[in-house]
Amino acid sequence: MIETAIAQLTNQENLDFTMSQQVITEIMKGQATDAQIGSFLTALAIKKATIDEIAGAATAMRSQALPFKVKRPTLEIVGTGGDRSNSFNISTTTALVVAAAGVPVTKHGNRAASSKSGAADVLEALGIKIDLTPAQSLALLERTNFAFMYAREYHQAMRFVAPARQQIKIPTIFNILGPLANPAHAEMQLLGVYRQALMAPLAEVLTRLGVKHAMVVHSRDGLDEISAAAPTDVIVINHGQQVTRILTPEQFGLTRCDHAALIGGSAQVNAAITRAVLTGEPGAPRDVVLMNAAAALHIAKPQLDLAAAFELAQQTIDQGAAAAKLAQLIQSSQAVMAS
């Protein structure tokens, strides 16, 4: 199958959903050589992946992941990465605030790729255990409204792809598949993308994957987040219907910050920023987290408009619930790991 796909791609012919799904499944079962995988990924990158190709590949990745069977709809807050902004861990900090506000969050992530600190790195630096089994993570979700699925453990078949990706050293379809391959099949999602051209295709892919409520965002200062330093382009998804809008800090009553104020560093540095935000320290990191938390809460609770969702995010931090959530997660993750 992969040989046929390579031939099609080199002729600039698109793959349909089924063929894309079959090829990625073949790759992730170890049935393709490194040379074949490298050729396939390079040819697809040159042609540029279509919605069918991305959706098929994401479906294959989901099917090969360790199962994580949730009992209720959950929310994912994630960025594609690759924006080269070196911002602190905005999505992860936002996820903790949203969980503290009562929304079940299933965060899927990894260690750093293009940044100095990935979601796994900063959660570990905060004292949260990340290497939990699915059963332990499900128990943590029930206790705390938050679970982290470490991509390396849930997508073990990615080991078949790693050598070819390292050898060809170019961005491939796998750079955008991670945020689409949440093992919990989250029905709600705040998805940040590193390039504006990816917004519309990935919005369509989310709908095909069964996501009911979502926002796909890209800020004009290049973040794969909603930015407190620039306007952010947004596609809102509600049961397959899409609406585009622009969000600015001023709409939330905030003063626009300099992009430099959002830059982080190592996992330890970013963990300190996260703690400061969760304990109510004012400044640009708090502002950007509040904006993203407002969007996420609006996705999860559509009855709240953005202004009400922003107020809920503020209350969650200022009344101590966010800091308490972090303390609970540290204690509970250690407890479930020991059980």
Curated annotation (Swiss-Prot):
Residues involved in anthranilate 2 binding: R165
Species of origin: Lactiplantibacillus plantarum (strain ATCC BAA-793 / NCIMB 8826 / WCFS1)
Catalytic function, reaction form: N-(5-phospho-beta-D-ribosyl)anthranilate + diphosphate = 5-phospho-alpha-D-ribose 1-diphosphate + anthranilate
GO molecular function, one term: magnesium ion binding
Cofactor(s) needed for function: Mg(2+)
HAMAP family, A to Z: TrpD
Lineage top rank: taxon: Bacteria
Protein name per UniProt: Anthranilate phosphoribosyltransferase
Alphabetical list of InterPro entries matching this protein: Anthranilate_Pribosyl_Tfrase, Glycosyl_Trfase_fam3, Glycosyl_Trfase_fam3_N_dom, Glycosyl_Trfase_fam3_N_dom_sf, Nuc_phospho_transferase
Keyword terms, alphabetized: Amino-acid biosynthesis, Aromatic amino acid biosynthesis, Glycosyltransferase, Magnesium, Metal-binding, Transferase, Tryptophan biosynthesis
Co-factor: note: Binds 2 magnesium ions per monomer.
Binding-site residues, anthranilate 1: G79, N110
